[in-house]
């Protein structure tokens, strides 16, 4: 009887050959590219007079450096204009499908691919971006790769990789009201550590995961990399299939029936052998906020920032660094910390369900006068849906700026940046030093609902106080 995990099955299906040194050559079913990590890769192909091996398996959009305030061409930022123009030319030359600004389907690559039905169970997916693990929510095995590997995939449709170990993270019970997928994944990273996943694929499972919507599952898998894992995935189920059905690039008619039959076979066997199993109680997770300079430095809204002596020895040095940079003290409460900027968006939490949750909190309320707040839809499709539902009006009436799709303040490659020592309440995925554009800017990661609550009060707040009124 088979004892294979979904990861084992997908890996073996895509293994082309075993390579000297112990790595495998893996075929990539879908290659996603954007304007920042692809120019050098295309340049390398040109230098060697090579063509893209399978143009139909590569899909492009623009997201990282695009402005979100004014997307009229040419852009004010010459570098942004140059990078996007380069991608336009490369896609035209190599006959690659490209979703540009104004196409109706442009946006953050990890938002766009699932909503178009490009992301499907059993696939191997690669992209020159750390958060490619997002697509694992569909039962695919998805890796972030560097520019040299982007080149390799363009030229050969394969990459060389060592097979990962598999850790199952079993989430028992369900999340409480006012607690979201973002809280759960921050809690997981805090419990295991930011390096615990090195060499692993994370399989997220259990009642709490089953209960999540597909968009919430994407949030979980998106942040696998923040826990050190190369990828994260969830076994596909009826929610997965319902989400994909009738999307633009989903299989149609008899092809759908064939695909569905295969997808249903793609799950970890009941007696799968894992390299490690971790069990967590999701019902104990609170709304969670980061206090430090890694996503693992987080705590529940009613908890106190840890004392140095309460931390493992290996965590104490980075904690001291975080205290100095963030301006927090051991034993301090994170609740009521004043915030200057509130950001809702990113490939972690820029989907329509994220905007709906935040808008529900903001309806008939006003953003604190002390706060600059803006929302950046994850894609043009998300923006269109939000406008059809009147969400943009709720955001604007509350005092949020409504922006155009892009990565925005998640990594601050465009003009959306913190200034000086500003503190940001952010629904993004990384709180590293200087991540949001200012060398001394400070980032507090939290769910979109928590960002909305912080925007209203001008300080870190428990969103449950709004929900339970």
From Swiss-Prot:
Its EC number is 4.2.1.33. One of its GO terms (molecular function) is 4 iron, 4 sulfur cluster binding. Residues 424-441 have a biased composition (Polar residues). NCBIfam families: leuC (TIGR00170), PRK05478.1 (NF004016), PRK12466.1 (NF009116). Gene3D superfamilies: Aconitase, domain 3. Keywords: 4Fe-4S, Amino-acid biosynthesis, Branched-chain amino acid biosynthesis, Iron, Iron-sulfur, Leucine biosynthesis, Lyase, Metal-binding. It comes from the Bacteria. One of its GO terms (biological process) is L-leucine biosynthetic process. [4Fe-4S] cluster binds at residues 347, 407, 410. Belongs to the aconitase/IPM isomerase family. LeuC type 1 subfamily. Catalyzes the isomerization between 2-isopropylmalate and 3-isopropylmalate, via the formation of 2-isopropylmaleate. Heterodimer of LeuC and LeuD. The gene is leuC. HAMAP family: LeuC_type1. It catalyses: (2R,3S)-3-isopropylmalate = (2S)-2-isopropylmalate. Binds 1 [4Fe-4S] cluster per subunit. The keyword Glycosyltransferase does not apply. Pathway: Amino-acid biosynthesis; L-leucine biosynthesis; L-leucine from 3-methyl-2-oxobutanoate: step 2/4. PROSITE patterns: ACONITASE_1, ACONITASE_2. This is 3-isopropylmalate dehydratase large subunit. Its cofactor is [4Fe-4S] cluster. Residues 424-443 are annotated as: Disordered. InterPro entries: 3-IsopropMal_deHydase_lsu, Acnase/IPM_dHydase_lsu_aba_1/3, Acoase/IPM_deHydtase_lsu_aba, Aconitase_4Fe-4S_BS, Aconitase_4Fe-4S_dom, IPM_dehydratase_rel_enz, IPMI_cat. Transmembrane segments: none annotated.
